[in-house]
């Protein structure tokens, strides 16, 4: 079984993070690759540029964003299943990393919920 967690990329890495995957399409501001200490930058599972720009972290668009992003994720299940399998092979812990300040209204929250159903 794989445990999936969420964490802002600006928080210090921990050995308990397991397989650390950045799920933003754009690299987080001010973050160096060394400091990020990620195992994978999964741009392909992040929201498309059009969806990301439309949402613009506006909580008023949150419900519609969730629906639209889940539709994108439906077409990307093989990549998500590969992530879970890799995390399982590396000890069973996957941490989805994101750069957004809003910890409740961001793509990683939607992705986390979606991956729980796989």
List where the protein language model places each region.
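Residues lining hydrophobic/aromatic ligand-binding pockets adjacent to catalytic sites
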Residues: 1-118
């Amino acid at each position: 079984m794989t445990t999936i967690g969420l964490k802002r990329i600006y928080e210090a890495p921990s050995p308990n993070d397991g397989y650390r995957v950045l799920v933003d399409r754009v690299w987080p501001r001010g973050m160096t690759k060394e400091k990020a200490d990620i195992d994978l930058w999964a741009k392909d599972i992040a929201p498309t540029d059009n969806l990301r720009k439309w949402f613009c972290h506006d909580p008023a668009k949150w419900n519609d964003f969730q629906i639209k992003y889940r539709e994108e994720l439906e077409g990307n299940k093989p990549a998500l299943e590969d992530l879970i399998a890799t995390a399982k092979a590396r000890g069973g812990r996957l941490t989805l990393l994101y750069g957004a300040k809003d910890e409740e209204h961001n793509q990683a929250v939607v992705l986390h919920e979606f991956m729980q159903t796989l």
